[in-house]
Amino acid sequence: MSGTVKDIVSKAELDNLRQSGAPVVLHFWASWCDASKQMDQVFSHLATDFPRAHFFRVEAEEHPEISEAYSVAAVPYFVFFKDGKTVDTLEGADPSSLANKVGKVAGSSTSAEPAAPASLGLAAGPTILETVKENAKASLQDRAQPVSTADALKSRLEKLTNSHPVMLFMKGIPEEPRCGFSRKVVDILKEVNVDFGSFDILSDNEVREGLKKFSNWPTFPQLYCNGELLGGADIAIAMHESGELKDAFKDLGITTVGSKESQDEAGKGGGVSSGNTGLSETLRARLEGLVNSKPVMLFMKGRPEEPKCGFSGKVVEILNQEKIEFGSFDILLDDEVRQGLKVYSNWSSYPQLYVKGELMGGSDIVLEMQKSGELKKVLTEKGITGEQSLEDRLKALINSSEVMLFMKGSPDEPKCGFSSKVVKALRGENVSFGSFDILTDEEVRQGIKNFSNWPTFPQLYYKGELIGGCDIIMELSESGDLKATLSE
């Protein structure tokens, strides 16, 4: 053996090597991961020191079939084979453990001692080991970095945006901002005395680029409250100058440091005040006319076609998803309405959604109402929308995602083997899909059997058309036609 590291190009090649019975060490890596690059130095020196073993690299994201076969969820990741079997694994940047595990697999079979760190190659070995170890520890705290897939990145961004009630994605860190806009937002948050988390987007290009698409917001900084985008520097500055930022935090249950108000008090809603204290009769009449100008009326920042804050955009998205006609008013264009409506409704932030003149609430309440089905119920009760037939409901569900899976359980926790197989096949092809757990709704479960003329589950739909159940999906997967079928 040459003592060099080679790249694996196919699963078949790896299977042949593994079945040869020789010691094989596999390094799963990613080009964006600094820890992978650092551990690759160690890996190369080990290949020189242990010529009896095969040393191979696999770029995890370029060979998902290999990564999935060995349950690779993070890089760097190492798999050790001996006599055709997997005998050990290692996740993360740990040079000492890697050297010891390689020694056990590829060293002398009679040796009772594990490989010493100095086995990293000639006199330079210990120096290289310590340098790499310190670099890995300093930059990544010896943690593995998650393999980037569309679903994994989305999940990571959701966790990051929800990691603190107030979360700022910025250039640099609060103590040392690396752009004027980031510095300005940090100063504002400190001025309103609110605790906040932060993430330096300069340190992680995957997050930097991913967040632009995730939030549909192309620049930084980005400020999030309770997982929802508030906006960038301009919006944060404008809200702060008007006093609205502090009010928004209060309405969302985010209290400032040292505040005596409890979250319950801060989260109290509004409701149109009978007295409208402090409003002139003329303004009160104008506001009453505006909130009743359409059956469903949204007071927002910007227009439905161009929202000027993330919360307003979210409510517009919900109303469009529910196919609800609504009127809107841009409060940024009329400060009299903007300030007066806060008093009229006893609700201090925007957006505000009204149904037949009655305040429903802001973005967080509207979102919860949609999730629980309460929004549709209220609109039906008030005569805004008619009672939805089962057929219409099924059509809406089937078309809610381009690829839609009706299954038992959820993709992360399937409750039958057939559903699990289909989920695995879709994920194996990196197909994004929506899902519905038929165990949670007997009406949908029975109704869709008749609707589709298909008596079993799971059922997979593409653009509203039934593709089939588990057997058909597995046949398409095995023939290599699944992704093509779901992208025509």
Curated annotation (Swiss-Prot):
Post-translational note: Ubiquitinated at Lys-154. Polyubiquitinated by RGLG3 and RGLG4. Polyubiquitination of GRXS17 leads to its degradation by the proteasome.
Binding site for glutathione: K408, R445, F457, C470, D471
Residue span(s) of domain Glutaredoxin: 154-256, 284-386, 391-488
This protein's GO CC annotations: cytosol
Superkingdom of the source species: Eukaryota
Chief location category: cytoplasm
InterPro entries: Glutaredoxin (IPR002109), GRX_PICOT-like (IPR033658), Monothiol_GRX-rel (IPR004480), Thioredoxin-like_sf (IPR036249), Thioredoxin_domain (IPR013766)
GO BP terms, alphabetized: auxin polar transport; DNA damage response; reactive oxygen species metabolic process; regulation of cell cycle; response to heat
Comment on protein domains: The Glutaredoxin 2 domain is sufficient for interaction with all BOLA.
Subunit note: [2Fe-2S]-bridged holo-homodimer. Interacts in vitro with SUFE1, BOLA1, BOLA2 and BOLA4. Interacts in vivo only with BOLA2. Interacts with RGLG3 and RGLG4.
Name of the protein in its database record: Monothiol glutaredoxin-S17
Organism expressing this protein natively: Arabidopsis thaliana (Mouse-ear cress)
Gene name per UniProt: GRXS17
